[in-house]
């Protein structure tokens, strides 16, 4: 059986990437549509520079996805702040060429709720090495997402360079001048231009670009944008950003074939799940179970494919909730609980603009609803189609079998009993529940005989433990080896798969089907 992929009307790559760009805005604490506006400014600047259609296409996609790697940055910031989205949002007004501004931002946000001595240590560590760690994680994630989206080597390489600076003081590789790909250099100008335009209009944009000229930004690009700023920023307000960004796609639109759509759906699933070690592989697992249940209930091939697609993207809105909330072991406060309950609506929000994906967002937005109206949004039986009931039951079952910060994973038998109990209480339809449980019990795909990147079976085992968030010492206890041996394994794995962080390794494992099913 093959999965139907991202079902529905024909889908342009640009439309999918633009939707993902909206999700990266949420994950980065940035204003919604910042990525779209940034892409427009980048393309218009590129047109004025006389770039070719191929070069403009690279600029277009890099500007849309330039912060995709930073979607996981919040998991690092969550260690020093209770709301990393607010911290990231506050950084939008920081001039990257002004060291005082950067240090003031760190002092304002890092460890604000911690005791004085611990806060001093956090701030000192952030100033000393935190930026490099963030840059490495952003690079690894950007490279993996770029590969999963199959958008070409130039775009992938440029996405990995969006934190580099013209003067070589960026990271993670301290590239300098024209060592940095042109799309990344254009991205840096357009990125700050939109942010500072929101804060202070044309004057603020020109000021920040002039201060950073020759430091953060290529002088030629900064000078050209400063001359064009009144015209470009006025044009930015002339039509809705979504319509404008689709119209601005350089060259002929790229339409995605069914197998490409399925790959893109998995990329979105991985983007949603990567923010927490507790949810790695969750969305793909829900999609498989939900599709199997839909077929058992007699839904058409198209409808079953739609359920599968909605399963892949159902948790995209999690990116708009602080990582610290998802990793909390104590009971949530009322305000934290309200933010958690918003995430299905955020999924619907970021997909609503797309004519091709909007129907999936509507369905995915119902994945926490219950027949008795006790779900997150209070939608009850008459307004819940069978597809939504299937998705909700599949999500509930799969979540029960996964560990969470506040509890251990249930066994499959215990999870099945729980789900049947909820059906008896009127939360789920019993027939839907039985279909979901039957779908979950189907044999999985055979294990790979040849591992990707030349990984050994032992290395695959170590990788599986690492992406679940275990420390080297914890992995050593599980594997009955020394922590030093585990560290050797980790370094060999990183060398083989071409990453340098666990986040990058996690995305590699997801892409290559190495995430093992939980018991």
PLM-predicted stretches and their roles:
Residues 280, 463, 487:
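Conserved catalytic core of two-component sensor histidine kinases
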Residues 463-464, 474:
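Transmembrane alpha-helical segments of multi-pass transport proteins
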């Amino acid at each position: 059986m093959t999965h139907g992929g991202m079902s529905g009307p024909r889908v342009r790559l640009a439309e999918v990437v633009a939707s993902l760009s909206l999700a990266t805005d949420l994950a980065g604490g940035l204003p919604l549509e910042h990525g779209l506006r940034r892409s427009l400014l980048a393309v218009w600047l590129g047109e004025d520079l006389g770039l070719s259609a191929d070069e403009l296409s690279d600029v277009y996609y890099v500007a849309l996805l330039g912060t995709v790697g930073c979607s996981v940055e919040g998991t690092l910031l969550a260690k020093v702040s209770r709301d990393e989205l607010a911290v990231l949002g506050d950084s939008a007004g920081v001039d990257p060429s002004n060291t005082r501004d950067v240090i003031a931002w760190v002092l304002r946000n890092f460890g604000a709720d911690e005791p004085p001595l611990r806060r001093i240590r956090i701030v000192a560590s952030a100033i000393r090495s935190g930026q490099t760690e963030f840059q490495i994680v952003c690079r690894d994630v950007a490279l993996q997402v770029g590969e999963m989206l199959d958008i070409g080597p130039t775009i992938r390489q440029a996405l990995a360079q969006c934190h580099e600076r013209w003067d070589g003081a960026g990271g993670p590789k301290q590239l300098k001048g024209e060592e940095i790909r042109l799309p990344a250099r254009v991205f840096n100008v357009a990125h700050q231009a939109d942010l500072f335009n929101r804060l202070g209009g044309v004057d603020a944009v020109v000021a920040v670009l002039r201060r950073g000229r020759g430091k953060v930004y290529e002088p030629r690009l900064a000078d050209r944008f400063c001359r064009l700023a009144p015209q470009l920023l006025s044009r930015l307000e002339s039509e809705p950003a979504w319509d404008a960004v689709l119209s601005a796609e350089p060259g002929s639109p790229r339409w995605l074939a069914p197998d490409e759509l399925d790959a893109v759906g998995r990329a979105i699933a991985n983007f949603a799940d990567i923010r927490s070690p507790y949810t790695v592989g969750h969305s793909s697992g829900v999609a498989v179970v939900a599709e199997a249940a839909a077929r058992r209930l007699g839904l058409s091939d198209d409808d079953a494919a739609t359920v599968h697609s909605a399963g892949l993207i159902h948790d995209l809105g999690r990116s708009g909730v602080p990582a610290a909330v998802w990793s909390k072991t104590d009971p949530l406060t009322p305000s934290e609980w309200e933010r958690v309950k918003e995430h299905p609506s955020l999924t619907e929000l970021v997909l609503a603009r797309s004519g091709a994906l909007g129907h999936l967002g509507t369905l995915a937005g119902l994945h926490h609803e219950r027949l008795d109206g006790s779900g997150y949004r209070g939608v009850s039986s008459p307004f819940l189609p069978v597809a939504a009931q299937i998705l909700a039951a599949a999500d509930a079952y799969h979540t029960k079998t996964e560990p969470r910060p506040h509890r251990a994973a249930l066994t499959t038998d215990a999870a099945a009993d729980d789900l049947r109990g909820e059906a008896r209480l009127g939360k789920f339809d019993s027939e839907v529940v039985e279909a979901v449980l039957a779908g979950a019990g189907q044999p999985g795909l055979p294990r790979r005989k040849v591992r990707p990147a030349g990984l050994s079976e032992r290395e695959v085992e170590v990788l599986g433990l690492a992406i679940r968030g275990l420390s080297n010492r914890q992995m050593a206890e599980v594997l009955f080896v020394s922590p030093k041996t585990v560290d050797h394994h980790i370094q060999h794995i990183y060398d083989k798969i071409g990453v340098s962080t666990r986040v990058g390794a996690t995305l590699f494992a997801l892409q290559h089907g190495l995430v093992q099913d939980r018991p």
